[in-house]
């Protein structure tokens, strides 16, 4: 299945996010040093990862480090980078490894996964695992349109990228007691009722509305 994501988010929607949310997001990223002084390949400490499991960190499309950067000759990362950021968030939630956002974006452009005016082709997810999996400790674990498969994969420790209406998000966990899924949205907007720090949502939200899921793409951990 090839899904050309219509992920060119409305610029007005993106710019309407309030300054407080952006400030909180930037503050949350500062683990020890700024990104500009760190190598592109780093791993968070176990204590930080445990903390992020309870309050997951989300890399956003409008981070000033890449928001205005052109993405493939049309549009920018802030409006069209959801497929890239969903991949980064899925890997980070999986094992604490940060993939360089623009390295992945440039790879998508180079290999023609960037579709100007439409977003990012879903082939990037398997390709990213093949290209960067060994470096960042993850592997491709298939794709499905089934909620039951999603639940099974999450219980086994996978994370998922989800194609919803005109957008990609990530799902990093499933709570058996509440029967809810932990969703990470790199461009949280009122129309999706998502937030900066992840949202536990019921299956009903994955079956209808702005988060109606069309397909799931899975990553599993592998040896570095």
Regions from the PLM with identified roles:
Residues 7, 92-224:
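Conserved active-site-adjacent core of cysteine acyl-enzyme catalytic domains
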Residues 1-115:
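Active-site-adjacent structural segments surrounding the nucleophilic cysteine of cysteine proteases
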């Amino acid at each position: 299945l090839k899904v050309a994501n219509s992920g060119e988010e409305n610029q007005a929607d993106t710019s309407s996010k309030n300054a407080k949310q952006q400030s909180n997001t930037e503050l949350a990223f500062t683990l020890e040093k700024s990104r500009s002084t760190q190598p592109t390949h780093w791993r968070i400490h176990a204590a930080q990862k445990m903390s992020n499991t309870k309050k997951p960190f989300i890399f956003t499309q409008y981070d000033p480090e890449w928001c205005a950067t052109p993405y493939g000759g049309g549009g920018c990362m802030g409006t069209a980078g959801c497929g890239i950021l969903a991949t980064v968030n899925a890997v980070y939630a999986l094992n604490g490894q940060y993939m360089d956002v623009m390295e992945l974006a440039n790879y998508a452009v180079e290999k023609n996964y960037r579709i100007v005016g439409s977003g990012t082709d879903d082939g990037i997810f398997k390709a990213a695992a093949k290209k960067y999996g060994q470096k960042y400790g993850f592997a491709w674990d298939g794709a499905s349109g089934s909620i039951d498969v999603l639940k099974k994969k999450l219980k086994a420790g996978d994370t998922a990228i989800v194609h919803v209406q005109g957008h990609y998000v990530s799902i990093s966990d499933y709570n058996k007691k509440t029967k809810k899924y932990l969703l990470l949205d790199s461009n949280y907007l009122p129309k999706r009722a998502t937030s900066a720090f992840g949202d536990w949502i019921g299956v009903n939200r994955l079956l209808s509305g702005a988060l109606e899921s069309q397909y799931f793409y899975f990553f599993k951990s592998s040896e570095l």
